């Protein structure tokens, strides 16, 4: 599972993470990969029939299933069943510096039951299903994780730019809904973008421990964990506990902030809008008239339209291995030591790559909150139309059918 690859320890292991250089290929994906795409998808990961493939997993049933599947398709397969002993010996494992940001259903379930799973040292937890709209409109909240509350994205942003609201408004909305800087806040959503948008906003505000439930409600239900339909209303609190924002540095709010940063530190502006939006064929939104991108924007991979970021998701709709994204970025001239501002139309999609850089411990990454929406509102800002140098769309190596 992602969390074990990322850095969490297996229950019988003394350390977590993955063997250096290991390719991630999760058994759960087998149910989602189209038969006619299997070989090309595996090849994009570096798995081909001319190599011997060694599979390892701490779950021996999963290991049996995936190795059998590959062998049946004609791959040269070997199985390593002793990963737990490997992890407990002195052999090195690799993990992401902030792997704890992305949690599994099993981790969250342990916290709900009063346990102290790895990296959890708190005794105050709130779980939120995140989507747009108040409770009456929140379809995704109809069935939810036991004890979860609804988080309306309007609590942190407003039109017409859909940037973060003022610190005062955000503070009022957070304390009205029981959120303080020192509670552990776990966010999940049907559409990852909403939860990661809010995670970024809560980090900006000053929540010290905010996590993302990777896989959302689908992953929770697949793990046979309980849901409920009753509406839970948070108890308001008197104070957030500190001044908002505590981390203004992760937000570049408007076009002039971007231009200032470009002059000061060579900031690269990374577009996470679909290829048709990036090249100016469409604006992507019925409420955004302008087409194009801020001048100099680099395409940073995206999704099929403004509602998804498919290049960043695995077949089972969990987040893709950040190491694969880094390889894609390198081809685009996007590197770890650069100053990088991710943006999209209004800031939801951009939160996904920002979250991944945060997991990896990258230091100089931001969300440019205003995005294309704010840029196209003022004709004084330079616009690029069409792909630079007529480049064709780069391959995301993620076509599973």
Task: Name these PLM-found stretches.
Residues 1-401:
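Cytosolic catalytic domains that perform sulfur/thiol-centered chemistry
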């Amino acid at each position: 599972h992602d969390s074990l690859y990322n850095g969490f320890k297996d229950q019988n292991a003394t350390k977590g993470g993955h063997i250096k250089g290991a390719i991630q290929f999760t058994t759960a994906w087998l149910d989602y990969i189209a038969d006619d795409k299997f070989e090309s998808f595996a090849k994009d990961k570096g798995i081909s029939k001319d190599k011997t493939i060694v599979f390892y997993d701490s779950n021996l049933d999963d290991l049996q299933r995936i190795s059998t599947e590959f062998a049946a398709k004609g791959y040269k397969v070997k199985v390593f069943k002793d990963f737990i002993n490997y992890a407990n010996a002195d052999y090195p494992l690799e993990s992401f510096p902030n792997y704890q940001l992305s949690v599994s259903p099993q981790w969250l379930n342990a916290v709900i039951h009063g346990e102290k799973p790895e990296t959890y040292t708190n005794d105050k937890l709130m779980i939120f299903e995140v989507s747009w709209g108040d409770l009456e409109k929140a379809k995704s909240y109809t069935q939810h994780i036991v004890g979860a509350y609804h988080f309306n994205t309007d609590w942190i942003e407003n039109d017409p730019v859909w940037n973060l609201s003022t610190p005062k408004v955000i503070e009022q909305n957070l304390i009205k809904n029981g959120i303080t800087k020192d509670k552990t806040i776990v966010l999940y959503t049907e559409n990852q973008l909403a939860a990661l948008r809010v995670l970024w906003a809560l980090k900006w505000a000053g929540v010290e421990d905010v996590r993302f439930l990777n896989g959302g409600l689908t992953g929770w239900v697949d793990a046979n964990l309980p849901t409920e339909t009753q509406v839970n209303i948070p108890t308001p609190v008197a104070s957030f506990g500190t001044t908002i924002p505590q981390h203004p540095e992760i937000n570049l709010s408007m076009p002039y902030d971007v231009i200032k940063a470009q002059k000061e530190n060579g900031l690269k502006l990374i577009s996470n809008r679909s290829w048709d939006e990036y090249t100016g064929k469409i604006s992507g939104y019925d409420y955004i008239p302008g087409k194009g991108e801020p001048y100099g924007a680099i395409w940073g991979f995206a999704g099929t339209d403004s509602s998804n970021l498919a290049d960043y998701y695995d077949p089972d709709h969990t987040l893709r291995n950040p190491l694969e994204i880094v390889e894609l970025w390198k081809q685009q001239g996007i590197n770890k030591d650069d100053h990088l501002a991710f943006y999209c139309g209004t800031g939801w999609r951009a939160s996904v790559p920002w979250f991944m850089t945060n997991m990896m411990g990258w230091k100089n990454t931001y969300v440019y909150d205003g995005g294309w929406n704010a840029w196209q509102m003022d004709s004084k800002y330079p616009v690029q139309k069409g792909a630079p140098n007529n480049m064709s769309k780069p391959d995301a190596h993620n076509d599973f059918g």
